[in-house]
Amino acid sequence: MNKRVKIVATLGPAVEIRGGKKYGEDGYWSGKLDVEASAKNIAKLIEAGANTFRFNFSHGDHQEQGDRMATVKLAEKLAGKKVGFLLDTKGPEIRTELFEGDAKEYSYTTGEKIRVATKQGIQSTREVIALNVAGSLDIYDDVEVGRQVLIDDGKLGLRVVAKDDVTREFEVEVENDGVIAKQKGVNIPNTKIPFPALAERDNDDIRFGLEQGINFIAISFVRTAKDVEEVRAICKETGNGHVQLFAKIENQQGIDNLDEIIEAADGIMIARGDMGIEVPYEMVPVYQKMIIKKVNAAGKVVITATNMLETMTEKPRATRSEVSDVFNAVIDGTDATMLSGESANGKYPLESVTTMATIDKNAQTLLSEYGRLNSDSFERNSKTEVMASAVKDATNSMDIKLIVTLTKTGHTARLISKYRPNADILALTFDELTERGLMLNWGVIPMLTDAPSSTDDMFEIAERKAVEAGLVQSGDDIVIVAGVPVGEAVRTNTMRIRTVR
């Protein structure tokens, strides 16, 4: 059995060699990126189980991210496997501003009072922390006295105790000992801020990524379907309508509008980091299960992300609770699990991917016993959906080793994946964009092939490719799903059970 749960690994300096130095060594950032050496490290991640690489545009410029993407393309050749490319937008963030002078961070003690400035374009001092707000918004009028301001994923909490209408600054009280560093994320829970749907930087980043040939875009802080539609318009305008859009759900507004967002997007990323700050933390696992269930029913891809193996950023082994977290996400029905800092800037990127792959593969063997996905409740509202359901029934009733589907758009493979059949899904397609677009679907092994010349040729190709890929051998039973007659614009209408010769 192959690993059916997909892994998204975030790339960063952890796997990159610069000037002969590894990340963390003196002089690392002054060196030039060694593409070949870095590609060898990334190839190891692919071999360990990474299916798609995430490029986090909250960090780095176009030059850095472009070099990173080029390195992955070389790594694909070294590993002999293709992967997906996912661009994650910075989104409408609030961050602490740059500091005056040479200061790197300021320390504070509980009960201390300082001020927070909302005026844009100024630098921070120890007494007045300035905020950099997406869209250059002045959020003074949006934040009420009594609200909490959380710095760096909640590591430092501030409470607004007064507002100064003259300076348009908040007086805040420090709630715990800690530090404030420059350019750290800021969250203000239970506060609606009128961010633009798409910041100018995000627009530029998306267009750059499309030029590089990305396959997926994760849209940060999605609040309504309109946020997704704006990005979709850019993709279509530039001739990239095939690029799949993942809405990141990370605040209460996104949760409240979840149904319309699922309908508008191609998939959902459960971004638990900011979600755990923006909503009560005890609700995060509740929302995770709810989101996975809804996305499963819609037949779309769901990625569970953030802090999954956080300990492995610094240590070579995951905690028992982290192992349970990854396991339970798979049991809940996630299509993919994601590594963030673990693979981007951690000390053990390869071990993190290997560990996640091991947990994912173990969990998938227990889906029939413990899995929460109930495909019996899915609406079968098309011939293809009925066919996908029948394929699952066949794998449950017989010892089917493999499902092979010939698909032009990937639609049939996605529907079969939706039902979580008890066999791998080999998706043979004639379009490389479709091949890469299936990199995140549960259980799907996408592969490029020549278009068949006839129906008989189609079945021969399906069997031959399955054998060549090492997925089956003589005597194994396989299910082949396709639309016939070949060459005509027909939907999937044929399912054949065939014994490999």
Where are these regions (language model features)?
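Non-catalytic helical/linker scaffolds that mediate oligomerization, partner binding
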Residues: 1-501
